[in-house]
From Swiss-Prot:
GO terms for biological process: chromosome segregation; DNA recombination; establishment of integrated proviral latency; symbiont entry into host cell; viral genome integration into host DNA. It comes from Methanocaldococcus jannaschii (strain ATCC 43067 / DSM 2661 / JAL-1 / JCM 10045 / NBRC 100440) (Methanococcus jannaschii). Coiled coil: none annotated. Keywords: DNA integration, DNA recombination, DNA-binding, Viral genome integration, Virus entry into host cell. PROSITE patterns: CB (PS51900), TYR_RECOMBINASE (PS51898). Residues 22-112 form the Core-binding (CB) domain. This is Probable integrase/recombinase protein MJ0367. CDD domains: DNA_BRE_C (cd00397). One of its GO terms (molecular function) is DNA binding. The keyword DNA damage does not apply. Residues 136-325 form the Tyr recombinase domain. Belongs to the 'phage' integrase family. The active site is at 177, 202, 275, 278, 301, 310 (o-(3'-phospho-dna)-tyrosine intermediate).
Length: 330
């Protein structure tokens, strides 16, 4: 496969993540440079420094460009405002807010002005604001992490790398369980509109899901090379035209995650498995304002509202169209 074709496939597979543009002024650059020099002298890993600088830019942008203050001029109330900004404007998760909190403690300590943040730190400790969040059975995958995993799979030497990356991208778009995507057959798929019928579900309830236009373009190209193309044949096939094994795609995902952990791009204490995509998709939809009852129906959770299951077809179509619009603007 030519490099240009591979790049086009990568561009289609990777999620379009919108990030608020930060105006990096000379003053912001000065603080970043001071922090970077100190951390490098401390022998901190480059990958850690990079992720810290990314978060620090957000903080410096807020206090310098929004509040009009230098970091050493902040009051306790300003730190409260910043974390409210992370929560309500940037939609930063609670676990990520804790990372910002830990970073700011380091920032003020290494720049020798810890007294500025000390009151906020003590107050936060007393009020258990950033107490360690209980680790769930699996951690969720977000769009940024998913892109790293997809790129790792695409760049591998595997003969099935495009198929495997496409399966994982469809898992994100649809929020499906792995078995639900691998069980898809041609008769379940509307490849003109990117609509899929999920029939053999854990809850024994049929549901309809959708995919993005980028995923659909790749699917249309991929199915041309399937060994078998009858209505009862699987959408994703192995070299003999049979169903792709769940163990295979789980191992592909696990290998990519482990490599990223070794590179320091994913924290080693994160419990990331292929089912983490489903958890992450649920969080992503809720963060984007999709009503919780629609998310329950879309993902096929056992606790989904029964009134939505039997809702009028028009209401169900509107729900799907709403999710399709979100996929198009990612």
């Amino acid at each position: 496969m030519r490099e240009k074709e591979l790049k086009h496939i990568e561009n289609l597979l990777l999620l379009k993540v919108k990030k608020e543009k930060i105006e990096e002024t000379d003053k912001i650059k000065e603080y970043l440079k001071r922090f970077e020099d100190e951390r490098r002298f401390d022998g901190i890993k480059e990958s850690t420094i990079k992720s810290d600088l990314d978060r620090l830019r957000v903080f410096l942008d807020y206090c310098i460009n929004y509040l009009g203050k230098n970091p050493e001029e902040l009051k306790t109330s300003d730190f409260v405002k910043f974390f409210n900004y992370l929560d309500t404007v940037r939609k930063v998760s609670k676990s990520s807010q804790r990372k910002y909190f830990l970073l700011l403690k380091v920032f003020y300590r290494v720049l020798r002005m810890y007294n500025v943040i000390q009151e906020f730190v003590e107050e936060s400790k007393d009020r258990k604001r950033f107490a360690r969040i209980e680790i769930q059975h699996y951690d969720a995958v977000d769009a940024e992490m998913l892109n790293m995993i997809l790129k790792k799979i695409i760049e591998s030497g595997s003969r099935t790398r495009i198929r495997d990356a496409l399966i994982i991208r469809l898992l994100w778009d649809t929020g499906c369980r792995v078995s639900e995507v691998l069980n898809l057959k041609y008769k379940d798929c509307d490849l003109d509109n990117g609509i899929f019928k999920i029939r053999n579900t854990k809850t024994h309830e049929e549901r309809t899901v959708v995919c993005s236009s980028d995923t659909l373009e790749l699917l249309r190209n991929y199915v041309q090379f399937n060994v078998r193309q009858g209505s009862d044949d699987y959408l994703f096939q192995n070299s003999q035209g049979g169903r792709v094994r769940k163990e295979w795609i789980s191992e592909v995902f696990r290998k990519a995650v482990n490599e990223l952990k070794e590179e320091g791009k994913i924290p080693k204490n994160r419990r990331i498995v292929i089912h983490s995509i489903r958890h992450g998709r649920a969080v992503d939809l809720l963060n984007k304002g999709v009503p919780i009852d629609i998310v329950k129906e879309y993902l096929g959770h056992k606790s989904m509202n029964t009134t939505l299951i039997y809702a009028h077809s028009k209401e169900r179509a509107e729900s799907l169209e709403f999710i399709k619009k979100l996929l198009r603007i990612q």
